Amino acid sequence: MSHIQRETSCSRPRLNSNLDVDLYGYRWARDNVGQSGATIYRLYGKPDAPELFLKHGKGSVANDVTDEMVRLNWLTAFMPLPTIKHFIRTPDDAWLLTTAIPGKTAFQVLEEYPDSGENIVDALAAFLRRLHSIPVCNCPFNSDRVFRLAQAQSRMNNGLVDA
């Protein structure tokens, strides 16, 4: 297992002034492992309040955060997902605040129970079968190979791939 510190406690960052939900009283932790380009915070420890995640994207990453919000809204008809508490989009930024889903990540389970790899793979496979059982004709999003290859080329051209 990797010994990277997966998140770091941090102070509340400077937020968009339109993020008018009550975020006071939460402790903040910044995610250190994601590679989406977005800044991700876990908000926790506020009495009688749900754990939350705040994702912030700037520039082209703001488009990715916006796309995630749209897909979460659509996918919620098919499976339990985090609740979108707040979303803000400006020309340069996107802020997505969601509830956390209770439980542990596959990484956390594997750290706690190192011999559970086969069970984790089975659980992930079951989830993917459920996701893939959604009829393609119901999906309004384009993610075909032509789109993805053009997106990959653009990312390489813009120096966003660290190969």
Regions found by a protein language model. Name each.
Residues A29-F141:
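ATP-binding pocket architecture of kinase catalytic cores
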Residues N18, D22, V109, R155, ...:
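Residues that form generic nucleotide/phosphate-binding pockets
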Residues N18, R27-R30, E118, A152:
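Exposed boundary/loop context
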Residues L23, T105, R145:
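Solvent-exposed, flexible loop/coil residues
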Residues A126-I134, F141-A163:
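Active-site catalytic-loop/activation-segment of kinase and kinase-like phosphoryl-transfer enzymes
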Residues M1-W28:
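Juxta-kinase regulatory segment immediately upstream of eukaryotic protein kinase catalytic domains
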Residues R12, N16, L75-F78, Y113, ...:
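Short, structured coil/loop segments at alpha-helix boundaries
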